Amino acid sequence: MRDVALSNRVRVFRAEHRLSQADLASAIGVSRKTISTIEVGRFVPSTIIALLLARFFRVPVEEIFSLEDEG
């Protein structure tokens, strides 16, 4: 298996919607820290959280998350 990393555009979508991390977290039922750690790439969200974010922003999950080759 290749080395890959999950990249995301959560911060971009959140900024476009003028939401704080706390606002977004509350809207999808997670903690602000969860949103923060997803945005900086320290936490890989569960499928459920990824789908909740996509549903909230009304975009396909692939517009928020993508795989990038490492190395």
Place the predicted regions along the sequence by residue.
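A short, Lys/Arg-rich alpha-helix, primarily the initiator
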Residues: 1-16
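Short alpha-helical DNA-recognition segment
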Residues: 18-36
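Short amphipathic recognition helices of helix-turn-helix/homeodomain-type DNA-binding modules
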Residues: 63-71
